[in-house]
Amino acid sequence: MALRDIFLLSMAMTAVTVQACPSACKCTVSLYGEMVVACGGMGLTEIPEDIPHRAVYLVLKDNNITKITSYSFKGLRNLQGIDLSNNKINHISSAALRHLGHLDDIDLSRNELTSVSEKLFDFPISSAKAQGRRFFVYLANNPWGCDCRMAWLAQELAGGSKTFGDRHMECATPAALAGRGLSEIPQTSFVCTGRDISFDSDGIIATPEESTAFPVAYKVAVVFGCITGLVTILLLVLTAMLYQKRRIRLGSKYELRWNKHPEFV
């Protein structure tokens, strides 16, 4: 085979266009069979649903994506790298990465995140440790709200974390902490008030204190169930009392008839 033919063959193998690629993306397969799905700078407002399951690297930077749900990466178990930098993400479900056991890094820098759940990274971190790999998260240049929800990350950074980068990790709120690095702030400064309302890691409206406990919707359901049960019991008791009272009245009526006209009873 001529040198020219070898060159053309290698070029074809390193840039194979995949038929099942989302319309807003470009899919290529490397010489080693690793698929790269590039959807950067396409004005996307959400993650495409038809990303090929064999994708290894997913590039979604420079778009207008606002949230990551628990189903955003469903079926994409082969992902090793995700680039979501420079979007408008303000909410990430704590279950978004729950199936990504091969993930090496995720870039969430330059978004609009004010808080992030520690649970979000549990599965990728534990999987990386079990496989002897390194897992890294880029979180720089987000408007962090330095309250109780971010205490865990501040503690990680202060301890010299090898998973979370500490560059450009400054507080945006509250005003007293604005501009200060998370790793420099004492744990006692990360406090919440009952008036602070926000979306928790699963998208349920709750106060920061409630975000670490049971979701508000769950509590409301429990209270509603208790009230419904109590009302049902009261209705049953009332029905039983009315039935008993009716039996007594009927018994008295028949007794009276017996006394007056025993021959007709």
UniProtKB/Swiss-Prot annotation:
Residues 142-193 form the LRRCT domain. Keywords: Cell membrane, Disulfide bond, Glycoprotein, Leucine-rich repeat, Membrane, Repeat, Signal, Transmembrane, Transmembrane helix. Residues 1-20 form the signal peptide. One of its GO terms (cellular component) is plasma membrane. Glycans are attached at residue 64. The chain crosses the membrane at residues 220-240. GO terms for molecular function: peptidoglycan binding. Its main location: membrane. It is found in: Cell membrane. It is a single-pass type I membrane protein. Gene3D superfamilies: Ribonuclease Inhibitor. Residues 21-50 form the LRRNT domain. LRR repeats lie at residues 51-75, 76-99, 100-123. Disulfide bonds join 21-27, 25-39, 146-171, 148-192. Binds selectively to the Gram-positive bacteria S.aureus and S.pneumoniae. Does not adhere to the Gram-negative bacteria E.coli and S.enterica. Probably recognizes peptidoglycans expressed on the bacterial cell surface. This is Leucine-rich repeat-containing protein Bf66946. It comes from Branchiostoma floridae.
